[in-house]
Amino acid sequence: EGVNMSYRTNRHSCYDLEYHLVVVTKYRHPVIDGAFKDRLTELTYRIFEENFQCYVNEINTDKDHIHILFEAPPQMTLSSLVCSYKTVTARLLRKEFAEYLAPFYWKPYLWSRSYFVCTVSERSHELITEYIRNQRNKEKG
């Protein structure tokens, strides 16, 4: 039997590691919107794909959190990725959107200290993708 074509490979491994990450804003302030949301999305792709060699399958936001569905190589450490992601996005976004964020945060905050992450199986992939895509729709409906 051949290798499943959905597997990714690198020099030393063949793998299929997919994760669903949710990061929440500090105090759940509703800051993820408009140009801020666009820049956050752009930074998310860049950090995950360029800095950590991950593949982003889906991103969606609500005003106080972001969902990221991504595949990662086995050598990637989840805690390092999340820490780096939160640190880099907070630093850049607080600098670029200082005036916009001023009414929400007096101290240099953006993200809550905690986060949610889970593995995604082949069976749950479609379900989680659909859930992430529908995040914005639930607040409108």
Task: Give each language-model segment a name.
Residues 1-141:
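Basic nucleic-acid-binding interfaces
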